[in-house]
Amino acid sequence: MRTDYLFTSESVSEGHPDKVSDQISDAIVDLFLSKDPEARIACETLTTTQLVVLAGEIRCKGVYENGEWAPGAQDEIEKTVRDTVKRIGYEQDGFHWERLEFINRLHGQSAHIAQGVDAADNKDEGAGDQGIMFGYATDETPDLMPATLYYSHKILERMAADRHSGAAPFLEPDAKSQVTLRYEGSLPVAATAVVVSTQHAPGYDEGGKEAELHEYVKRVVAEVIPPVLLRETKYYINPTGSFEIGGPDGDAGLTGRKIIVDTYGGAAPHGGGAFSGKDPTKVDRSAAYITRYLAKNVVAAGLATRCTIQIAYAIGVSEPLSLYVDTHETGTVGDDKIEQAILGIAKLGGLTPRAIRTHLGLNKPIYRPTAAYGHFGRKADGDFFPWERLDLVDDLKAAFA
């Protein structure tokens, strides 16, 4: 296992066009789950110049049944879309929450898919699709996330907070960040490069205003990344020059195109399935959450300093096909023993789709906040981000006492 290397991760802001699409899709998921906790949703969003299009499949009691929309339902969907765009902050000529065109092409879920997923008298609820999902944790940061991604997210979160508060009125919603760290002995010792590209108000690409923008970004970086890591950093701030046209007006956005930003910044494998726009019967989402939860608790319990967990499902089948643990030669016990310990935790109730949703409480409108700045490494707060809890630590320790 390599211990000395350079590694890089990137993040994108809430105003990035793909993230606008993710947030709209998850706002729709939340809308339907607030009406029916057992709703089925697969909502894809396209955003481009003054246009938002929804497409996908749904089933929701009291909202869409037997091929018909309930009175007022489509108006509520449109309001949810516009409110989401407004919250992000888009009031530009090329993309404005109030003036954009909205097209709704959501329709009913296939009965053939539903019959494989729904529980029946003779079977438990099946997985919503086949697939492999991964979870990961590392002790590099307090949130047990890869440091490169952790810092990339925090830079953009801080910039967005300053934009919303008015502290940085020259910022516009679209932005990207990228952080390269040098590792020695598997620990980050220096940030060798920081890249920040941010949409800005007119005039901030030259002269004194450009210098003001650059100094602002460097201040944010210095408040996010420890000074000891910034001694040899090269900064690349809006390296192409002007960035006035951005967001969906600059590039079309689609749901599910930032899956590495959403997860571990390339530090861990990814099964390929996106999260946003999907209700929690879709194991692309719920199983990725449970594997993060398990990996995080393994590291927090002191059983390893790094942990990757894979799980696999078949559509319509409730029990997982496999569970795989890899502690990357950092484990204090055998990886196979950790697998056995996980399967032996009674309060989990198993790793079926329904057991996952029940244990984590996923049938709730909790998803829009996940759709920007990462699904993982966030603070568990009430119903939100329950997969970040550390309530299996004692169970895992007890298994090896």
Curated annotation (Swiss-Prot):
Main location: cytoplasm
PROSITE patterns from the UniProt entry: ADOMET_SYNTHASE_1, ADOMET_SYNTHASE_2
This protein's record includes keyword Transferase: yes
Keyword terms of this UniProt record: ATP-binding, Cytoplasm, Magnesium, Metal-binding, Nucleotide-binding, One-carbon metabolism, Potassium, Transferase
Binding site for L-methionine: E57, Q109, D251, K282
Catalytic reaction equation(s): L-methionine + ATP + H2O = S-adenosyl-L-methionine + phosphate + diphosphate
Enzyme class: transferase
Sites where the protein binds ATP: H16, D174, A175, K176, D251, R257, K258, A274, K278
Cofactor names: Mg(2+); K(+)
Cofactor: how bound: Binds 2 divalent ions per subunit.
Binding site for Mg(2+): D18
Record's subcellular location: Cytoplasm
Pfam families for this protein: S-AdoMet_synt_C (PF02773), S-AdoMet_synt_M (PF02772), S-AdoMet_synt_N (PF00438)
Enzyme Commission identifier(s): 2.5.1.6
Cellular component terms (Gene Ontology): cytoplasm
Residue ranges, annotated region (Flexible loop): 109-119
Subunit annotation: Homotetramer; dimer of dimers.
Free-text function comment from the UniProt entry: Catalyzes the formation of S-adenosylmethionine (AdoMet) from methionine and ATP. The overall synthetic reaction is composed of two sequential steps, AdoMet formation and the subsequent tripolyphosphate hydrolysis which occurs prior to release of AdoMet from the enzyme.
Family: Belongs to the AdoMet synthase family.
This protein's name: S-adenosylmethionine synthase
